[in-house]
């Protein structure tokens, strides 16, 4: 299994209080005045003060080659806030900053470095509060209520730029070419990086860098930038600035997974669960007009209606895509839920998954071999597990200290209420029966006979996403399940964390003195009828896993209190996020894909029709990032996921994988 460790930066502070990298023997910023140097080199070198007021798009995108202490980002954020205060009516409303860092600082070192610039404290404190764990890949931080987005890519920039999705091509407005000096870190300053910068730069994009090294100037020129020298900051004689004046048409490396968005920011979302709610917020933040159609009388009547749900990442012993996606999705979910200005029952108590038999112990051993950061997942022996969860288990496992339980029903309703305050239009008791494309719009028809017309449509209606002609071929299936509600007892009330075994048991909700235990699993079953056998099995699985635990015998399901729901799942346990693929066109266009990959056209899709679904049993974990991914795609904005993992979420993936191998799609 692939190791997921990212090495943190090792640094010390010199006599001037400047952080110095031990790995590269170089300062993170100038001893003289790092803040002023950033303003001169990167903000001034890219002419941002004069460009912001005349920018013709609501979003300005900056990319950077080395995040370091975040000085460049914080300085830019401060300047952007000043611009917004001075020009509240300007077209430019939001800032998106993309940065790469191979050796991220620890949160403590970051805070120490930030003490150097007291005037940046209001922005630095927000960055520190959301500072991510050292996981490889992209970490999206939503700051200042979403007006500022920071994408932190942890890993080697020369490797990461090769892994970026094609939708990021020609989107960057300005480049900050920063990092340790070329003489100290020659591995970063490569033609591969310069070519990637050119590929990502939109026509007219600028760049600035502190160095004036000849090989850097020549490399950027060869990549396509028009370069010039400028007076350097302070004692430095020269620096470099550049402009992308060429207009290139980059090739698509995997056109069968290409994603397209929409220039028309108006949509209908079909659904009423957590995915619909979070997508509404993400689109509203980007200036969309959003109408939500829900078949029920109120939100959260489907799979999102449970009283308690566990929040922790899915890990796999064999699927690299799962192991890339879910840890990132989990950390994003925690940041988002923490920041939401709404109330819902929850407890960030942690989740512990136990190895109660040989098979489950082997699975946990394989999960631990991923070498995930301790802040995300770590091993527990039997004694440590009992101390963590508060009850006798007599077995060890893996613990997720940032895991939790929360009330999906309350969360969903609160988010939809928040979105309504921000402009969301809601239509309840609207059951969609069909979608018809009419003159670049979609006509929606409901059981009541009512119709509506929208520019774009998102299907986020759980296990019913494949009820329409366009989506019927999607390889998804329904999973019925029953969660039992049980009263607490003195012994059960000792449970401090969510306990996962061949089922799960939550700590009591102090607002109702009840636990949730579950859940039964019925593939292909859409029934929501209460079942006595499911109630009994929910209890029996706990007793089977912990036969010697007296506290487990106190689980009482005789009150017959439970909730039945239906989830939507896929064979590979990953969500479906993106354009709705045209099944018949896909099979026709890609009939000889295995032998003609180089000439393949972009994936056939239904224009303006999207899907967000198949979240399975980990919707609380995956829904926030999936909603953010789809909102970014629909808005033609940077997507916070590498191309390979993003392909693993594409609704057409199961068909395309077979076609790439020359196999028949059934």
UniProtKB/Swiss-Prot annotation:
- In short, the EC number is 2.1.1.61, 1.5.-.-
The answer, when asked if S-adenosyl-L-methionine is one of the entry's keywords, is yes
For this protein, what is any one GO molecular function term? tRNA (5-methylaminomethyl-2-thiouridylate)(34)-methyltransferase activity
Q: Cofactor(s) for this protein?
A: FAD
Record flagged with keyword Disulfide bond = no
What biological-process terms (Gene Ontology) are attached? methylation; tRNA wobble uridine modification
Q: Where is this region: FAD-dependent cmnm(5)s(2)U34 oxidoreductase?
A: 270-666
Question: Where is this chain's protein located in or outside the cell?
Answer: Cytoplasm
What does it catalyze? 5-aminomethyl-2-thiouridine(34) in tRNA + S-adenosyl-L-methionine = 5-methylaminomethyl-2-thiouridine(34) in tRNA + S-adenosyl-L-homocysteine + H(+)
UniProt entry keywords in alphabetical sequence = Cytoplasm, FAD, Flavoprotein, Methyltransferase, Multifunctional enzyme, Oxidoreductase, S-adenosyl-L-methionine, Transferase, tRNA processing
Q: What is a single Pfam family found in this protein's UniProt entry?
A: DAO
The segments labelled tRNA (mnm(5)s(2)U34)-methyltransferase in the record are: 1-245
Source domain of life is Bacteria
| Major subcellular location class | cytoplasm
GO CC, one annotated term: cytoplasm
HAMAP family, per the entry: MnmC
Known function? Catalyzes the last two steps in the biosynthesis of 5-methylaminomethyl-2-thiouridine (mnm(5)s(2)U) at the wobble position (U34) in tRNA. Catalyzes the FAD-dependent demodification of cmnm(5)s(2)U34 to nm(5)s(2)U34, followed by the transfer of a methyl group from S-adenosyl-L-methionine to nm(5)s(2)U34, to form mnm(5)s(2)U34.
Q: Which family does it belong to?
A: In the N-terminal section; belongs to the methyltransferase superfamily. tRNA (mnm(5)s(2)U34)-methyltransferase family. In the C-terminal section; belongs to the DAO family.
Which NCBIfam families does the entry link to?
Answer: MnmC_Cterm (TIGR03197), PRK01747.1-1 (NF002480), PRK01747.1-2 (NF002481), PRK01747.1-3 (NF002482), PRK01747.1-5 (NF002484), tRNA_MNMC2 (NF033855)
Q: What is this protein called?
A: tRNA 5-methylaminomethyl-2-thiouridine biosynthesis bifunctional protein MnmC
Q: What organism does this protein naturally occur in?
A: Salmonella paratyphi A (strain ATCC 9150 / SARB42)
- Provide the taxonomic classification: Bacteria, Pseudomonadati, Pseudomonadota, Gammaproteobacteria, Enterobacterales
